[in-house]
Amino acid sequence: MSELATIIGGPVSPYVRKVMAVCDIKGVAYRIDPIIPFQGNDEFGRLSPLRRIPVLIDDEVTLADSTVIAEYLDERHGTPGLFPKTPAARAQARWIEEFADTRIGDVFIWRLFNAAVIVPSVWKLARDDDAIARVVREELPAVMDYLETIAPPDGFVFGALAVADVAVAVHFANLRWASTGADLAAWPKTCAWVARTEAVPVLARLNQLAERSLTTRRTERPALYAEFGIPLAAASLAGKEFRKGPLSV
């Protein structure tokens, strides 16, 4: 690929971190426009009709879904492969990623991180701790119960690190940043699996970047991303107003 790819979306999003991780593991160089989805201008809405991040732009295609992007990058850029080899295992990997993107994302991101962090900081509404506690009590256990049935006793689900492992693990940092008080000790296999995945240097680095970006002012972004060796896009698709997408909760 002759030019740097562009990733639109900030690393606080687990879906953006998933794509950044795939790029880093495969050695795909990229620049980033670290906007939040509610911040995108009209051009962003054209590229991402659902007004969601990430968006990937490279010399061949523009894509606006993290699952599609991850599979495209894996197919285009070869080794190391991040999907298992057999049809059955690949189907299982896609299912795990789908569960992560939808069910884990719904509970961890929309119902917890969004309610605890985005609603107060972006929409300037009060954090509803009673509603958050109810989700932790009534919805989170079912997610964790299922993950406990698929968590490997050691290593990763398919032996080598795969997108499926990354897709699950990226949500757990956002759960911690939401400060919900959720106690995950009842699911030791899942916690150990996530910890192993988060300890992979690429993931550890991206979590560090994301956590720091939570408290980094816009004027300080260039220095932060320069520190992590990630160039910023020359022009940003950030708009002046915050607006929700058609599927926003």
List each model region and its residues:
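GST-like domain detector, emphasizing the conserved glutathione-binding G-site
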Residues: 1-134, 234-249
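Sequence-pattern detector for short linear motifs
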Residues: 20-21, 55, 196-199, 224
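Residue-level signature of transmembrane alpha-helix interfaces in integral membrane proteins
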Residues: 43, 117, 181, 216-218
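Phosphate-coordinating loops and pocket residues in cytosolic domains that bind phosphorylated ligands
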Residues: 46, 199, 208
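Generic N-terminal initiation segments characterized by hydrophobic and/or small/turn-forming residues
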Residues: 79, 137, 141-144, 211, ...
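Acidic/polar loop patches that form or flank catalytic/metal-binding clefts of enzymes
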Residues: 82, 204-206
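Acidic/histidine-enriched, glycine/proline-rich intrinsically disordered or flexible terminal extensions
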Residues: 210-249
